[in-house]
Amino acid sequence: MIEPSHVLKPVRHRLAQYGVAAAAGLAFAGLSLGALMMASGAARADDLYRTEYDISIFGLSIARSAIETTVNGANYNLNGRFLTSGLARVFDDTDGTVHVTGSAVGGKVVPKSFDLAYKHGRKNKSTTIRFANGNVVAAENQPPVKKRDPWVETSPQDLLNVSDPLSALMIPAKNGRAVCDRSLSVFDGQTRAEIRLSFNGTESFTTDGFTGESVICSAKFIPISGYQKGKKAIDYLSNRSRMTISFASLGNSGIYAPVVARIGTQIGTLKIQATRFSKVN
C-alpha cells in the first residue's frame, strides 16, 4: 500500500511554491477571466472576476485556489488564496496568498509585480518579483534559496523578456492551433524555464461560467537556470514527464487561458482543472 505521506512528499514543495500547481512553471490558478478580457480591451473599469481551480492526483483533491481580479482600464490587480485540501491537508498543511499586477501592452499581458506568501507547516516563506518592460529587475526569496552543487546560476540575460508563472499563460492568438505554436519564458523567483508548446488536438470543456471547445497543447519543460543540475525531479520533468495544457478562448476576446493541465510526475499524474471561470460584476 502506498502511504499518503510518501505520495505527497514529491508534490508538496512545488505546490507550496506556486500555491496551486506542481512543477515546471505550469501553475495557472491565478489566471483570471478579468485579466484576459482586459487584454482584449473588452472589460470596463472596475470589473471583478473570480476563478477557482482544483488540483488532484489519483482522483483525490490535494489543493484548491480562489482568485479575484479587478480590472481598471488597461491594468489588472489579482489577489488569490490557495491551500491544501482533503487528505493532503492531514500530511501537508500549506496556506498562502498570491498578488499579481500588470497591464496590457501591445496585445500582450505584461506583468509588473508578483508576490507570493505562504505558510508551509510552521515555516513562513515568500517570493517577490518585480518587472520593467518585460524584464526582471528584482527578485527575492525568503528564506533564501539553498543552492546545492552542481547549481546552474541564473544570468542577467536569462531574466530578459520573461513572465511570472501566472502571467505567462495568458495567450493572445488568432485561433486554437496558434495557441500551441510558441514557447513560454517563465521565471518563478528561483528557476528560469522554457515551456515549449505543440498542438495535440481539441476537446470540449464545461465549468461554472464557461462552456465551449478547448485546444490541447503538449508541453515540454526545459530548465534554463536556477536549479540543481542532475536533480531527479527536474530530470524527470524535462526528459520523461508527459504534460498537456488545455486552453479555452473567452468569447471573442482573442485571448486564450488554461482550463485543464495534466502533469506527469514520478508518482502519478497531477491534474489541475478550472471549477469556476466567471464574471462577478
Positions of predicted regions on the chain:
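Acidic, serine/threonine-rich low-complexity disordered tracts
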Residues: 44-133, 176-281
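N-terminal secretory signal peptides that target proteins for export/translocation
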Residues: 1-19
